[in-house]
Design a protein with these regions (language model features):
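Selective transmembrane alpha-helices of multi-pass membrane proteins
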Residues: 80-105, 168-192
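Short, membrane-interfacial amphipathic segments enriched in basic
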Residues: 1-2, 153
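Helix-coil boundary and interhelical linker segments in multi-pass alpha-helical membrane proteins
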Residues: 76, 80, 129-136, 190-192
């Protein structure tokens, strides 16, 4: 079953519409979607190494644009929905303190979240909700997302065939590691 799923992903990744799917997933992941674009970027680069940097560009640009939408969600919808609730429970002042602290380190928070597997959408929405300077947000987003996607694409470009062979020979192990990492990430987010 894993082999069929892998083969299907590889055929999808080398398909004509793969760049469009990558752009859509990258955009959505930055604002509301839970699946990281690496799920498509990695097999796409493995399937077509010569397009590695074009794919990284697509992922970066659409992710940053999606991040701007996430920022807008935080700036315009979060306060309309959450502010009355926070005020009702007496937490509005605590949120304002959180916002001040968040904005003090905002560029670093956005950058770190942008290069790690941490759900980037949480930070894009929080950046808008706390009023982080939009220019600071965008610069940190471009640098972080660009670094993340170009490093992944670059490594796969340089070491493509051996990595593909490694993945194909150890598909079960790779899937197990992925699932454990995914579940561990969700648990860490829930309890940290």
């Amino acid at each position: 079953m894993l082999r069929r799923l892998y083969d299907w992903t590889m055929s999808l990744a080398s398909g004509r519409r793969a760049p469009l799917a990558l752009g859509a997933v990258s955009f959505a992941e930055s604002s509301f979607f839970p699946i990281p674009p690496d799920i498509l970027l990695i097999p796409m680069v493995i399937a077509r190494r010569t397009k590695a940097f074009a794919y990284a560009t697509i992922a970066t640009v659409t992710s940053v644009v999606g991040g701007a939408v996430g920022y807008a969600i935080g700036a315009f919808l979060f306060l309309q929905v959450a502010e009355p609730i926070l005020a009702f429970y007496g937490y509005l002042d605590k949120f304002e303190q959180f916002g001040a602290r968040f904005n003090e380190y905002g560029a670093w928070i956005v950058f770190i979240a942008g290069v790690t597997p941490f759900p980037y959408k949480v930070i894009t929405i929080a950046s808008g909700a706390t009023g982080l300077d939009f220019a600071v947000f965008m610069v940190a987003s471009v640098l972080a997302r660009g670094l993340r996607f170009f490093v992944v694409a670059g490594l796969l470009y340089l070491f493509g065939p051996p990595i593909r062979t490694f993945i194909e020979k150890r598909l079960g192990l790779m899937f197990t590691i992925f699932v454990v990492g995914l579940v561990g990430g969700f648990i860490a987010i829930k309890f940290l």
